[in-house]
Design a protein with these regions (language model features):
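Phosphate-handling catalytic cores of nucleic-acid transaction enzymes
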Residues: 1-212
């Protein structure tokens, strides 16, 4: 849902603006739970709806390039003003490969992007300064406890990037599905999900907390 909403929707909360981006990482011991398998149906839905995704294997520079190329212009339905946003979803079944080993520069960028700054400046390969308007990054990834420890420096655990992440841990599979085929009802439900995501993707503007 966050991938469909992008940076087009916002909740103003006092002096703060909240956008619907999440950093979610599925964690389980290797071979004990099917993390990547659980993610595949979601990936297919996002591609079917046309959500912009980061490249599968990227360097920091390529990721920044993907983010910059994802920019779109939207008209605010409330004010009529023109807004530019660069919304990109990272979908990585091997999240620690995506992060790299102690890649402090990329981890610092991801920490910055979580806050969805209006302008994000960076130094280019040829030492120039460029910027991206309306940064918005959304992440769903998967890894193992051991790989988290090896990929991240100790001082990153519990603060910085990891404090912005939601780690979903599972020790083992809940059950084994011997015949993983959709029933007619599930196929119909999937089509409804695609329809809902397409409608959600069209939403834009300010959201408000209801009095209820």
């Amino acid at each position: 849902m966050a991938a469909a909403l992008q940076r087009k929707c916002v909740l103003h909360w006092g002096s703060l603006d909240f956008y619907p981006n999440l950093y979610v990482v599925l964690v389980a011991p290797s071979g004990k739970a099917r993390k990547g398998t659980a993610m595949i149906p979601g990936l297919k839905l996002l591609k079917e709806v046309g959500i912009k995704l980061a490249s599968n294997s990227v360097t920091r520079q390529a990721l920044i390039r993907d983010l910059k190329r994802s920019n779109e212009t939207e008209i605010d339905p409330t004010t009529g003003s023109m807004d530019i946003h660069a919304s990109l979803t990272v979908f990585s079944k091997e999240f620690t490969v995506f992060l790299g080993f102690h890649n402090n520069e990329l981890m610092s960028d991801l920490t910055d992007w979580y806050d969805c700054d209006d302008d994000w400046e960076y130094r280019t390969k040829h030492e120039g300064i460029d910027d991206i308007k309306g940064v918005w990054v959304n992440i769903i990834g998967a890894t193992t406890p051991d790989l988290i420890q090896s990929a991240m420096p100790l001082d990153a655990i519990g603060g910085g990037l990891t404090s912005r992440m939601i780690f979903v841990y599972e020790q083992r599979k809940g059950k084994t599905v011997h015949t993983p085929f959709y029933t007619d009802d599930e196929i119909a439900l999937r089509q409804k999900l695609v329809y809902d995501l397409e409608k959600i993707r069209m939403l834009k503007g300010d959201f408000h907390v209801s009095k209820d």
